[in-house]
């Protein structure tokens, strides 16, 4: 691991001075070779898949691990989309002339060496490497042992693209050591790695949070809420809350808890919950919500427990609570939320403004689905992940989140007096 770190640190200097043309050339070459080697990628990936089946992995795991022609084409298209993104490196914001005569600005520069730790999705090898490459960083990729053959081949393709553009192949390295001790060492290599970006389940993130010495860009949970205010448009509330929960269940920006103002609950809950039950969503409800729904003929309701309010289901399960007002809703979010994404449905501007100002989450929304908390939807292009921390990056992390700002001073011989 130390040798990998040394090589990455050396390569990061070359990447920092690489031109946009070089970086884009590398990305386009990688996209071309990914398409050319689609069958080989699938064959190698099948080795990983068969091994996972022998090891008893479940169907969802196998699905994440499997690379299909569609998956591979999506990777190639993603590379081409990153080429189209503006290169942030070297850009200087507005220069401000100071009283002394000097001009002061800030230049965007790479972070240096980024470590990506991820689990069973081999497409992350391409996606993460591409974003790090475009932002002028070197990257060390440590994927799950279950995808080692796929990741090794994809790394070879990436390094071929780097060489074709005259960039150091060590700018992208895949850790082929499958021992978990490699992760333990990687997250303490402060002399070589500037930031760790973990992509995986809660147990992985929790372990890294406890053991890492290298700073991380991460989120632990996506416990996202939507609050339907007393002044909400009912049709809008049904449409938005349906989408927030059922458009896809697994993403971290899917709604997990619905909060409903008691004054509008009898008007909106019956219609909305019929939509949910028709789609097979299990409803875990508090006493007031149960009363409202049972009065309208609903059955098969589950009593919500304390654990439900703090659970990221990633499944067709929804917790619902009826609240007295916006204050109770925001207090619930503050107590149980994960500071990821929370939304209010209301036509009351004062209530909307309060929610935006007082809810302490990375993304706060008015009259929109929490599913919009995504790098592509925010116009960032691809994203390396989502952060619910407050320092360095917050929310969806795109190219700018893989950079920092340094001060630049332009003078004309000025001296300090």
UniProtKB/Swiss-Prot annotation:
Q: Where is the protein situated, by its record's location annotation? A: Cytoplasm
Entry EC number(s): 1.2.1.41
Please provide the Gene Ontology terms (biological process) for this protein: L-proline biosynthetic process
TM spans (from-to):
none
Q: Top-down, what is the taxonomic lineage of the species of origin?
A: Bacteria, Pseudomonadati, Pseudomonadota, Betaproteobacteria, Burkholderiales
Any matching Pfam family: Aldedh
Q: Which GO terms describe its molecular function?
A: glutamate-5-semialdehyde dehydrogenase activity; NADP binding
Has UniProt tagged this entry with the keyword NADP?
A: yes
List the pathway annotation.
Amino-acid biosynthesis; L-proline biosynthesis; L-glutamate 5-semialdehyde from L-glutamate: step 2/2
CDD domains from the entry?
ALDH_F18-19_ProA-GPR (cd07079)
Q: Which GO CC terms are listed, alphabetically?
A: cytoplasm
Q: What does this protein do?
A: Catalyzes the NADPH-dependent reduction of L-glutamate 5-phosphate into L-glutamate 5-semialdehyde and phosphate. The product spontaneously undergoes cyclization to form 1-pyrroline-5-carboxylate.
Q: Which UniProt keywords apply?
A: Amino-acid biosynthesis, Cytoplasm, NADP, Oxidoreductase, Proline biosynthesis
Catalysed reaction(s) here are:
L-glutamate 5-semialdehyde + phosphate + NADP(+) = L-glutamyl 5-phosphate + NADPH + H(+)
- Which HAMAP family does the record cross-reference, listed alphabetically? ProA
Task: List the InterPro entries.
Answer: Ald_DH/histidinol_DH, Ald_DH_C, Ald_DH_N, Aldehyde_DH_dom, G-glutamylP_reductase_CS, Glu-5-SA_DH, GPR_dom
Q: Primary place of residence?
A: cytoplasm
Q: Which family does it belong to?
A: Belongs to the gamma-glutamyl phosphate reductase family.
Name this polypeptide is given: Gamma-glutamyl phosphate reductase
């Amino acid at each position: 691991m130390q040798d990998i770190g040394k090589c990455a640190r050396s390569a990061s200097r070359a990447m920092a001075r690489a031109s946009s043309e070089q970086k884009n050339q590398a990305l386009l070459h990688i996209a071309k070779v990914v398409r050319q080697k689609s069958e080989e990628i699938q064959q190698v990936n099948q080795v990983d898949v068969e091994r996972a089946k022998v090891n008893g992995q479940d169907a969802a795991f196998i699905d994440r691990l499997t690379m299909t022609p569609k998956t591979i084409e999506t990777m190639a298209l993603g590379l081409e989309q990153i080429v189209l993104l503006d290169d942030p490196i070297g850009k200087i914001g507005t220069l401000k002339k100071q009283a002394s005569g000097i001009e002061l600005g800030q230049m965007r520069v790479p972070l240096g060496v980024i470590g990506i730790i991820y689990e069973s999705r081999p497409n992350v090898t391409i996606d993460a490497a591409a974003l790090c490459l475009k932002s002028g960083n070197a990257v060390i990729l440590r994927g799950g042992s279950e995808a080692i053959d796929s990741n090794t081949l994809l790394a070879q393709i990436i390094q071929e693209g780097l060489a074709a553009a005259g960039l150091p192949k060590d700018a992208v390295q895949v850790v082929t050591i499958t021992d978990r001790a490699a992760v333990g060492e990687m997250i303490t290599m402060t002399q070589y790695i500037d930031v760790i970006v973990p992509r995986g389940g809660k147990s992985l993130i929790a372990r890294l949070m406890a053991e890492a010495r290298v700073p991380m860009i991460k989120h632990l949970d996506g416990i996202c809420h939507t609050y339907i205010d007393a002044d909400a448009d009912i049709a809008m509330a049904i449409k938005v809350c349906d989408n927030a929960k059922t458009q896809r269940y697994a993403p971290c920006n899917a709604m997990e808890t619905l909060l409903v103002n008691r004054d509008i609950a009898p008007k909106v809950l019956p219609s909305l919950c019929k939509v949910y039950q028709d789609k097979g969503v299990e409803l875990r409800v508090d006493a007031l919500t149960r009363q409202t729904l049972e009065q309208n003929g609903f059955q098969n309701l589950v009593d919500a427990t304390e654990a439900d309010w703090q659970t990221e289901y990633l499944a067709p399960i929804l917790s619902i609570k009826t609240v007295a007002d916006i204050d109770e809703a925001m207090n619930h979010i503050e107590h149980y939320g994960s500071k990821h994404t929370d939304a209010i449905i209301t036509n009351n501007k004062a209530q909307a403004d309060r929610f935006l100002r007082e809810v302490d989450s990375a993304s706060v929304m008015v009259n929109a689905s929490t599913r919009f908390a995504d790098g592509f939807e925010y116009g960032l292009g691809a994203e390396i992940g989502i952060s619910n921390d407050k320092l360095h990056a917050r929310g969806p992390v795109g190219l700018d989140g893989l950079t920092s700002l340094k001060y630049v001073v332009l003078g004309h011989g000025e001296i300090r007096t």
